[in-house]
Every structure is written in C-alpha cells, then in structure tokens.
Amino acid sequence: MKLKTLTLTHYRNYETAELNFSDEVNIFIGINAQGKTNLLEAIYCLAMAKSHRTSNDKELIGWGHEFSHIEGMLSYKHGTMPLSLSISKKGKKAKVNYLEQKRLTEYIGHMNVVLFAPEDLNLVKGSPQIRRRFIDMEIGQISAVYLNDLSNYQRLLKQKNHLLKQMKLSNSNDMTMLEVINEQFAQYAVKLTLRRKMFIEQLETLAIPIHTGITKDKERLSLRYNASLNYELAEQEMFEETIRILNANMGKEIERTQSLYGPHRDDLSFKINDIDVQTYGSQGQQRTTALSIKLAEIELINQEIGEYPILLLDDVLSELDDDRQTHLLTTIQHKVQTFVTTTSVEGIEHETINKAKLFNVSEGQISTN
C-alpha cells in the first residue's frame, strides 16, 4: 500500500498543508523543532487513530483552534481509498471512503504502518508495558477481532480492579460478583494470550534470518512470550486452569487491590546466543534486535494482509551504522513506501537520496526540491 496524498488542517504547527508523495522514499529535512516529526506523527495517526508520542489528543490540535483534521488517499493493489481522521475536544471521528466508522476499532487496519524511531530501542531495554503496547498495536493492525477482544478485556480489568478495591474497603467476604467477573475475564485472557503467542512465534520465524543476515551469521536471535497463564494447554483446558488460578487467588488480589494474573502482566524477552539482550546485550546488539523486529514486522504484515505496510523512520537512518542502514534499505527497496525525517542528508546512502522525493521543512512550512 502507498499513501499518495496527505492533507492537514490545524494539525500541531501546520495551519494547512497539502502533500503529494513518491511511492518509494520521501525525506523530510530540517533542523529540530520545525515540524518534521509532526508529519510522521500525522501519517501514524491517520493509520492508528492515535499518536505514538502523546496520549493527550488536545496536543494534536493547532493553537487557538477547536479541531484538527488529517486526510489521505491510500492506494492498494486493487484501487484507492480515502481515509480521514478529525480530532476535537469532544473526541475523534474516522471515515473510510467518506463513511464515518461507528468505532475506531473498525477504522484501524485499513492503513498499515511500521514506525521505527530512536525510542524503539526501549522495545528491547524498556519496561514490559512498552513491549505489551507494541504487541497489542501490531496485532491490532491485522486483526479487528483482537482489537475487540482487547477492548473487552481492558473493560473487565478496570471493572475487576474497581471491585477489588471496594471489597477491601468494605471488608467483604462475598465472592459471588468477583467469580462472575473472573469467568468473563478468563475468556478474554485466554483469547489474547493465545493470539499473542501465535504473533510472537510468527515474528520470531521472520526475525531470525534477518538478524542472522545483519550480524553476518555470528548471532542467533530468539524471542519468548512470558505469559502469566499456561499457553501450552489446549484452549478449553487453559480456560479452566485460568478460572482455577483466579478463584484460588481472590483473597490475594483483594488484599493487593489489583488483578495479578492475565495478559496485562505479560512480557516479551529477547535472547542472542541464549543470553538475555535486555540485561546483558550491548547497545549495538539491542539496536540490531530492535531493527530485526521492525523488519520482521513489515514481512509479517505483508504475509497477513497481502500488502506491504508503510514505513516511518523518525531520525533513525543517521543513527544506524553503514551495515545496518544498508540492510534496512536493501530489505525495503522497491517494496515499501518509506518516510524519513532527518536534520541532514549526510550519512544517508547517496542511492537512496537520488531516488527520494525531498521535502524541506521550516517553521511549519514545507517546500519540495
């Protein structure tokens, strides 16, 4: 898939902007704090209906305005599709083919993106919450069912935690309501855990040869989904085991006033040659691991939906050494539409620059060469 055009209205520091893109590489050039990353963020928002930089949607609305609007024309193998996202203080409205979607979960997945930014090193060395968010966002792009299950799970998790606090405050011994919530909670916990397990296995299969290529066969990468539930069981057995664990630990959860078991407690670990990369890996190994995961993600989305996603590279090409940059650019060449932000084209392969469409960004104004 390719993003042919992007139109912004009152988006961050852009009063208005209309851009036409190359199907190959598009590079936004400018000094810091001019709005380069805002453009990548707008593309990400158009795909995911949320920012990767802030959870406060009000920040996306230009100063002094009541709303912001992002619009894009997407092309696929079989045609084109207009997408739009309007953001106001009242909420968000998303349209596909000019038709408003009832839920954002119905909108997400029409446009697929993979973002690689300097902070993605935190995917390897950061908190488990970062890795869970990564898993949820990436599966959500290719599975509307997963997004729906995740939404239901998060709703039940919130209800359960609220009930646990009430039970501790009232010193209640009546477990009836908690048992009812646990049964519903377990159903979605099992669904999410099994889907995540499958995703991690698929990702590992694709990431291993990529990582081996980057490291010139010196290192072997492995991924493991560390779940609080036993995913080696059949689905029905797993559900029954989960119910047993939840009900056996009700007293403990009431005392702690939080849900101690379920996908919201899970993590993803990375090993190189059987050594934990998060704890013992060098920065170079952590960066290579993150790059391998991102490139594997591109291939996984293509396998699942039959289209390559759009790649967003936020100030990372200059941070990659020659070998990693070459591997990245070779992998995506002629297959993946790519958007790059950089303060300078120095350090980027000449071949890439020569075939790219360049956009100069300064104080919210954009010009092309």
UniProtKB/Swiss-Prot annotation:
Gene3D superfamilies associated with the record: P-loop containing nucleotide triphosphate hydrolases, RecF/RecN/SMC, N-terminal domain
An example Gene Ontology CC term for this record: cytoplasm
Compartment list: Cytoplasm
InterPro entries (alphabetical): DNA-binding_RecF, DNA-binding_RecF_CS, P-loop_NTPase, RecF/RecN/SMC_N, RecF_2
Annotated keywords: ATP-binding, Cytoplasm, DNA damage, DNA repair, DNA replication, DNA-binding, Nucleotide-binding, SOS response
Task performed by this protein: The RecF protein is involved in DNA metabolism; it is required for DNA replication and normal SOS inducibility. RecF binds preferentially to single-stranded, linear DNA. It also seems to bind ATP.
Protein name: DNA replication and repair protein RecF
Source organism per UniProt: Macrococcus caseolyticus (strain JCSC5402) (Macrococcoides caseolyticum)
The organism's taxonomic lineage, starting at the top: Bacteria, Bacillati, Bacillota, Bacilli, Bacillales
